[in-house]
């Protein structure tokens, strides 16, 4: 029966010894964000009134990493089992709310599954998420009488007959706050592990005459936990396969779904084509008919209609208007902006720079802290010298400017419309419209000159 309010408890106190890492286990990433963040996001999407995070190992780093989330931090100083962890959070439970118990190392749990679990919880009883496994070794078994759930027996405490049961406990459950506090106060550690098992409350509820309703997830992988890096890598591939399938069904052409990673969210138009080994990070928007070549990384960027990003280009916190082309081997750093029809070629880097409509920087160029007008040609080897060792300065280039190869523009400097900058020029002062600028050293040709000969 659906209660009006619900709080979520996320257990995240484990050290993760088998990860062989100094990083708390739940902070290891899946699809570009910490495992526990996936669970927090699910809790928030469910509309949880409060999210209680039970922590132990690496608490300072957890708090720093998750500082943007509104969490109630609950310390479990000693890891004495799941029941003990819930006991630490129990003082924060309201009697008239539902309490949903989740795990920071079970990152793929689906909101749809949790919604069904919440809706299935009987009045005064417990909603329990279970799955059936061909090999349930190591998991707590679900015991039933006449089809009704009566309890959970941990593998180490189970009889030979009970170990034949294939239905196992996932650890995810929901119960009323007042009931849960009462059951938690009765837990003991009289078992093979010497721990306080949250699973013991199932038998308590049954003995009190309360109903326990079991719900199954849509996919077993939703309840898979992570104890080592191998398991984490497997969940990563499961997650990525699911995301690739959704994109393909929505009309995005992934040339090889097994070689595509989505580490954030992707909004897209029609007829988008993505080649192999492309990584999408953060929030990315691709317009209609966008083409992305192999090996590209796109992060927190907006790519307009009919743009083409050639292989091995990196685009971060950038914006491309319609019909722009970049790469191969181009790098757009935060603040880069290309207006309609602009082109950035191989080994060109932009940061905090705007390239106007139809303007081109074909190769071997750095454009930083710059405003570049329309129909500008930036020759190979051009550098905007924006940093004096202490401060950054801006370069402004007007429309229809031609910048010859191997030129340096020492900021702060403004280049007027229609200016031509001869190859090899170092520009240190502002230039008025339609002027020619050159600062080459005069060429000297020495006839009959011979190279020095090495002494043997």
Swiss-Prot record:
Residues binding acetyl-CoA: 380, 386-387, 405, 423, 440
Gene3D superfamilies given in the database record: Hexapeptide repeat proteins (2.160.10.10), Spore Coat Polysaccharide Biosynthesis Protein SpsA, Chain A (3.90.550.10)
GO biological process assignments: cell morphogenesis; cell wall organization; lipid A biosynthetic process; peptidoglycan biosynthetic process; regulation of cell shape; UDP-N-acetylglucosamine biosynthetic process
Record carries keyword Acyltransferase: yes
Cofactor: Mg(2+)
Region (N-acetyltransferase): 251-456
Region forming the signal peptide: none
Cofactor note: Binds 1 Mg(2+) ion per subunit.
Predominant cellular place of this UniProt entry's protein: cytoplasm
Protein location: Cytoplasm
Pathway note: Nucleotide-sugar biosynthesis; UDP-N-acetyl-alpha-D-glucosamine biosynthesis; N-acetyl-alpha-D-glucosamine 1-phosphate from alpha-D-glucosamine 6-phosphate (route II): step 2/2; Nucleotide-sugar biosynthesis; UDP-N-acetyl-alpha-D-glucosamine biosynthesis; UDP-N-acetyl-alpha-D-glucosamine from N-acetyl-alpha-D-glucosamine 1-phosphate: step 1/1; Bacterial outer membrane biogenesis; LPS lipid A biosynthesis
Region (Pyrophosphorylase): 1-229
Single annotated GO MF: glucosamine-1-phosphate N-acetyltransferase activity
HAMAP family: GlmU (MF_01631)
Biological role stated in the UniProt entry: Catalyzes the last two sequential reactions in the de novo biosynthetic pathway for UDP-N-acetylglucosamine (UDP-GlcNAc). The C-terminal domain catalyzes the transfer of acetyl group from acetyl coenzyme A to glucosamine-1-phosphate (GlcN-1-P) to produce N-acetylglucosamine-1-phosphate (GlcNAc-1-P), which is converted into UDP-GlcNAc by the transfer of uridine 5-monophosphate (from uridine 5-triphosphate), a reaction catalyzed by the N-terminal domain.
Protein name: Bifunctional protein GlmU
Gene from which the chain derives: glmU
């Amino acid at each position: 029966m659906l209660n009006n309010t619900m709080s979520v408890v996320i257990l995240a106190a484990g050290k993760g010894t088998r990860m062989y890492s100094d990083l708390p286990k739940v902070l290891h990433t899946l699809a570009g964000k910490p495992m526990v963040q996936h669970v927090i996001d699910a809790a928030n999407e469910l509309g949880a009134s409060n999210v209680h995070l039970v922590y132990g190992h690496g608490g300072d780093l957890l708090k720093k990493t998750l500082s943007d989330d509104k969490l109630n931090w609950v310390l479990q100083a000693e890891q004495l089992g799941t029941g003990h962890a819930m006991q630490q959070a129990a003082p924060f439970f309201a009697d008239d709310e539902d309490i949903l118990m989740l795990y920071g190392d079970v990152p793929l749990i689906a909101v749809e599954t949790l919604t069904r679990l919440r809706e299935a919880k009987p009045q005064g009883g417990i909603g329990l998420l279970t799955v059936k496994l061909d090999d349930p070794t190591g998991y707590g078994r679900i015991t039933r009488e006449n089809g009704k759930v009566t309890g959970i027996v941990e593998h180490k405490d189970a009889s030979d007959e009970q170990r034949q049961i294939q239905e196992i406990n996932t650890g995810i459950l929901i119960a009323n706050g007042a009931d849960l506090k009462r059951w938690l106060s009765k837990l003991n550690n009289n078992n093979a592990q010497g721990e306080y098992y949250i699973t013991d409350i199932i038998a308590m509820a049954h003995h009190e005459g309360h109903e326990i309703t079991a719900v199954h997830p849509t996919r077993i992988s939703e309840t898979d936990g992570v104890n080592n890096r191998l398991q984490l890598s497997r969940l990563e591939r499961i997650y990525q396969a699911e995301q690739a399938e959704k994109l393909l069904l929505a009309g995005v052409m992934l040339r090889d779904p097994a070689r595509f990673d989505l580490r954030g969210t992707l909004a897209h138009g029609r007829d988008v084509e993505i080649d192999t080994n492309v990584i999408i990070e953060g929030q990315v928007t691709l317009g209609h008919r966008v083409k992305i070549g192999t090996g590209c990384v796109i992060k927190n960027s907006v790519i307009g209609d009919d743009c083409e990003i050639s292989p091995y280009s990196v685009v971060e916190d950038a914006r491309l208007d319609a019909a722009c082309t970049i790469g191969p081997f181009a790098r757009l750093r935060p603040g880069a902006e290309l207006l309609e029809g602009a082109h950035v070629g191989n080994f060109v880097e932009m940061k905090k720079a705007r390239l106007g409509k139809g303007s081109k920087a074909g190769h071997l160029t750095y454009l930083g802290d710059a405003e570049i007008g329309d129909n500008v040609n930036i020759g190979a080897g051009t550098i905007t010298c924006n940093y004096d060792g202490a401060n950054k300065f801006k370069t402004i280039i007007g429309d229809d400017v031609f910048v010859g190869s191997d030129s340096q523009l020492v900021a702060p400097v403004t280049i007027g419309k229609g200016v031509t900058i001869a190859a090899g020029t170092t520009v240190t002062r502002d230039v008025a419209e339609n002027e020619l600028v050159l600062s080459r050293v005069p060429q000297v040709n020495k006839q009959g000159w011979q190279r020095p000969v090495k002494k043997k």
